[in-house]
Curated annotation (Swiss-Prot):
It comes from the Bacteria. Signal peptide: none annotated. The keyword NADP applies. Catalyzes the folate-dependent formation of 5-methyl-uridine at position 54 (M-5-U54) in all tRNAs. It comes from Pelobacter propionicus (strain DSM 2379 / NBRC 103807 / OttBd1). SUPFAM superfamilies: FAD/NAD(P)-binding domain. It is found in: Cytoplasm. The gene is trmFO. Its cofactor is FAD. The lineage of its organism: Bacteria, Pseudomonadati, Thermodesulfobacteriota, Desulfuromonadia, Desulfuromonadales. The keyword Cytoplasm applies. This is Methylenetetrahydrofolate--tRNA-(uracil-5-)-methyltransferase TrmFO. GO terms for biological process: tRNA methylation; tRNA wobble uridine modification. FAD binds at G9, A10, G11, L12, A13, G14. PANTHER family: GLUCOSE INHIBITED DIVISION PROTEIN A, METHYLENETETRAHYDROFOLATE--TRNA-(URACIL-5-)-METHYLTRANSFERASE TRMFO. It catalyses: uridine(54) in tRNA + (6R)-5,10-methylene-5,6,7,8-tetrahydrofolate + NADH + H(+) = 5-methyluridine(54) in tRNA + (6S)-5,6,7,8-tetrahydrofolate + NAD(+); uridine(54) in tRNA + (6R)-5,10-methylene-5,6,7,8-tetrahydrofolate + NADPH + H(+) = 5-methyluridine(54) in tRNA + (6S)-5,6,7,8-tetrahydrofolate + NADP(+).
Length: 454
């Protein structure tokens, strides 16, 4: 067929990309290494396997991931269709039966006449044709070696994530803005000062905190520059304050003296609506992170948009390598999608695949523009972040309202998320009119919606 697309990886991103491209009349060859070869984390034989939790997180528009799900629903997402068809009771979250979910997606993909599913490992990137790489966080060694030829030293094999808090949840009476030795702009960093007693209590909490147990395939050899903060605390009382919590070159303007220790917060985006805890990569459990980090002066009411983690995760430095369309700058016939781009989470991976599939199809069928979604939408905010973030400090990110452009005018904090969601869905409507396939979707078989889950 004239318009053909190769997709490597049939997880959530790859399946969503294949579905969106096929809906637009593009012939897709979808490569999946299972069942011939499996990663240590995969157990089911089918496509779109949920490796960790069976939850796609909150469904409310008060959460950015809830908004992202609604945008995908309105865009005709296969992954959201499968989730709704296989959901199980989970309060305010959208959780699924993972076996039925995989079965549903597998049935839809294999039934589509424009999608050719090929089993077996792809150990190299095709030299010709349009390609979407959606090989996921556990990309095989052979494929990773091929990818390194495209990405150089900007392909990573584990993440080292520090928590991120919203700027408006910080207590500005306790934190102060300053860069070490007065270098840089005054508010490049915010600083949380600790006296000796506060520091000792904090170190003790880190030593006692509950840690996440690493699965066998996630056991890491930590480099000194990426050591979990709790491991540093365990080396001795003063290790942290001579490491990431060192106070040298910082003077608290309220006391006129150098604090005993300091936790620095660095702006995560240009708008400075989010700050990350510098050097605070951690393997503490999420409840422990919230509890312990809220004992830090100035963070007592911190709202966390991302919590820390360290685990096996193959991903690229997307802002250094990708265009806003998720195309490789050095070779635009190649797209990346899913967690390998640096998005974090099931729904985010599906969203990334959704966009890659649409854009690849538009380019292959000669549409006039790639139709990048508006930055006001969850889809647009997420892809804008991963392709425009600070190259020097890039780490995986899930969708959150801190990524969105500010609202105009003064909005009450409790109304902000609702207004952001309202604006997003209004922007989405016009965008979907441009990118949606014809009402009669090319090649989709009659009754394809019906999947027997018995």
């Amino acid at each position: 067929m004239k318009h053909s697309l190769t997709i490597i990886g049939a997880g959530l991103a790859g399946c969503e990309a294949a579905w969106q491209a096929a809906r637009r009349g593009v012939s897709v060859t979808l490569h999946e290494m299972k069942p011939e070869k499996r990663s240590p984390a995969h157990h089911l034989p089918g496509l779109a396997e949920l490796v960790c939790s069976n939850s796609l997180r909150g469904d409310s528009l008060e959460n950015a991931v809830g908004l992202l799900k609604e945008e995908l629903r309105r865009g005709g997402s296969l992954i959201m269709e499968a989730a709704e068809a296989t959901r199980v009771p989970a309060g305010g979250a959208l959780a699924v039966d993972r076996q039925l979910f995989s079965d549903y997606v597998t049935a839809k993909i294999t039934a589509h006449p424009l999608i050719n599913l090929v089993h077996g490992e792809m150990d190299a990137i095709p030299a010709e044709g349009t390609v979407i790489i959606a090989s996921g966080p556990l990309t095989s060694d052979a494929l990773a070696a091929s990818l390194s030829g495209l990405t150089g030293d900007r392909l990573y094999f584990y993440d080292s994530i520090a928590p991120i808090v919203t700027a408006d949840s910080l207590d500005r009476e306790k934190v102060f803005a300053a860069s070490r030795y007065g270098k840089g702009d005054g508010d490049d960093y915010l600083n949380c000062p600790l006296d000796r007693e506060q520091y000792q209590a904090f170190v003790e909490q880190l030593n006692r905190g509950e840690k996440v147990a690493a699965r066998e395939f996630e056991k890491l050899v930590h480099f000194e520059g990426c050591m979990p903060v709790e491991e540093l605390a365990g080396r001795g009382e003063d290790t942290l304050r001579f490491g990431p919590m060192k106070p040298v070159g910082l003077t608290d303007p309220r006391t006129g003296i150098e604090p005993h220790a300091v936790i620095q917060l660095r702006a995560e985006n240009r708008e400075k609506t989010m700050y990350n805890l510098v050097g605070f990569q951690t393997k503490l459990t999420w409840p422990e992170q919230r509890r312990i980090f809220r004992t830090i002066p100035g963070l007592e009411r911190a709202e966390f948009v991302r919590l820390g983690s360290m685990h096996r995760n193959t991903f690229i430095n997307a802002p250094a390598l990708l265009q806003p369309t998720q195309q490789l700058r050095s070779d635009p016939r190649i797209f990346f999608a899913g967690q390998i781009t640096g998005v974090e989470g099931y729904v985010e991976s599906a969203g990334s695949g959704f966009l890659a599939g649409i854009t690849a199809a538009r380019l292959l069928t000669g549409m006039p523009d790639p139709a990048v979604p508006p930055a006001e939408t969850a889809l647009g905010a997420l892809v804008s972040h991963i392709t425009n973030a600070d190259v020097r400090h890039f780490q995986p990110m899930n969708v959150n309202y801190g990524l969105f452009p500010d609202l105009e005018g003064r909005i009450k904090k409790k109304e902000r998320r609702g207004k952001l969601a309202e604006r997003a869905l209004a922007s989405l409507s016009g965008w979907l009119e441009r990118v949606s396939p014809p009402s009669r979707e090319t090649g989709e078989p009659t009754g394809a919606e019906q999947v027997d889950l018995a």
